[in-house]
């Protein structure tokens, strides 16, 4: 009897460790955005899109990033980067409990992930623009299932700036 209880507890502990790791984006994904699934990307047409509104903002403004698909997805990993390069810069903030900001090696909350066993066909993320002049895009990896994922899906370009002066500036 003790052996059976010990075996059940060992299996439960093993399952708990696997479940606690679920929902985490591995740090290796930050560089190439590839999920650690060991499979090739699908050759089927991309069923997902990223739209942004508005596409021209000033620092402090909010951009709605809308992720949608003709098929449901179980995960998305989103990074904000320069429009002319793959450079990563700070990104999105949380909207739902299953959403989480991700810390990449070069910064804090500069990527976003959603991972769930409950599939979605849309997800909205509000992003607050920094006080800078730049052109950026969002790049995403979509995971439909363990063996089906698409990498490098890009949003339309967003123009940031020009820099605004403070509204409450003191006149000299």
Curated annotation (Swiss-Prot):
Domain of life where this protein originates: Eukaryota
Keyword list, A-Z: Antibiotic, Antimicrobial, Immunity, Innate immunity, Secreted, Signal
Cleavable signal peptide: 1-21
Domain Reelin span(s) in chain numbering: 22-172
Tissues/organs with expression: In adults, in hemolymph.
Localisation per UniProt entry: Secreted
Gene3D superfamilies membership: Reeler domain (2.60.40.4060)
GO terms of biological process kind: defense response to bacterium; defense response to protozoan; innate immune response
Keyword Nuclease: no
Claim: tRNA processing is one of the keywords in the record: no
Primary subcellular site in the record, as a coarse category: secreted
A single Gene Ontology CC term: membrane
A Pfam match: Reeler
Protein family (similarity comment): Belongs to the insect defense protein family.
Primary role: May have antimicrobial activity.
Protein name: Putative defense protein
Organism, scientific name: Locusta migratoria
């Amino acid at each position: 009897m003790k052996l059976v209880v010990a075996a059940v507890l060992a299996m439960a502990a093993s399952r708990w460790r696997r479940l606690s790791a679920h929902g985490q984006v591995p740090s290796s994904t930050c560089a190439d955005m590839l999920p650690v699934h060991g499979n090739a990307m699908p050759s089927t047409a991309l069923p997902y899109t990223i739209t942004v509104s508005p596409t021209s903002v000033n620092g402090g403004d909010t951009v709605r990033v809308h992720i949608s698909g003709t098929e449901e997805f179980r995960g998305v990993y989103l990074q904000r980067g320069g429009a002319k390069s793959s450079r990563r810069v700070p990104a999105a903030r949380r909207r739902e409990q299953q959403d989480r900001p991700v810390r990449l090696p070069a910064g804090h909350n500069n990527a976003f992930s959603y991972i769930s066993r409950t599939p979605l066909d849309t997800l909205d993320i509000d992003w607050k623009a920094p006080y800078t002049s730049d052109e950026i895009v969002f790049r995403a990896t979509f995971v439909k299932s363990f063996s089906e994922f698409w990498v490098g899906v890009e949003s339309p370009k967003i123009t940031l700036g020009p820099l605004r002066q403070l509204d409450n500036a003191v006149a000299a």
